[in-house]
């Protein structure tokens, strides 16, 4: 124990400069560690067009639809739809845990389908996975009685998940600062076409794929169709009500833009040709004036007009005086003639 004292005193002596100049370094190191830890714990939510994200939720939908109990005879195979995912993203940006008010409106949530279905999930952002959200919807089957088609609670998400006629799905997850009592929340929305209802059972029970269409084939216990399942990329379509709306120039917009550029070029060429053929048709001094020059020019014009008016007045006065003199001369001559006649 006694041998450790010099070491302790030496350590304290070396730590004195640290107390003076190294406190700031320690604070900066602590801040860096906090930032590093937060960055490691932070999760980045996937984009709605991320391929891995799309494959995850589409495959899980088909897996759960193909594994329904009782077995389904007419459930369709689901594929991704970009317009539905854009609608999910647009509504998710509002950070409202309420259903989209445009689902039944024509071309408001999809350029082709109307009567769109929608499932929603809200939870902490750092806990989100597509699997957790979709399986929470599937868990609602516990509240659904397939025999009489009734729910003991809210099972609308499950019904839409296994709705037989739905074959297109598009999902998106959006971060929100707060939804309800959840801070740093994530809202996950999936849209379906055609959408389901609560008016009947979600599918027809029976041996899988026995009630598929004529041109359908059985894929993973579901009815697939190459034409129906073909992906359509709606390049220029976005929800009209999305704010802020993405800037998109469709073919008509591109045509008008090119037409304006062409007209501008033709106008410039025409002006250059006219100026080359008639060099004096436009004089720069006559076409371009500064405000001071224009005011000075106006004053000069007014002065010139006043001079002209004065000159005209003077000319008129001179003419009147000349006429008066001529009359007086004529009168004098007439009087002289009369006098001469009288003398004779």
UniProtKB/Swiss-Prot annotation:
It comes from the Eukaryota. CDD domains: CAP_GLIPR1-like (cd05385). GO terms for biological process: sexual reproduction. Highly expressed in testis. Detected in prostate, kidney, bladder, lung and bone marrow. It is found in: Membrane. SUPFAM superfamilies: PR-1-like. Gene3D superfamilies: CAP. Residues 292-304, 312-334 have a biased composition (Acidic residues). This is GLIPR1-like protein 2. It comes from Homo sapiens.
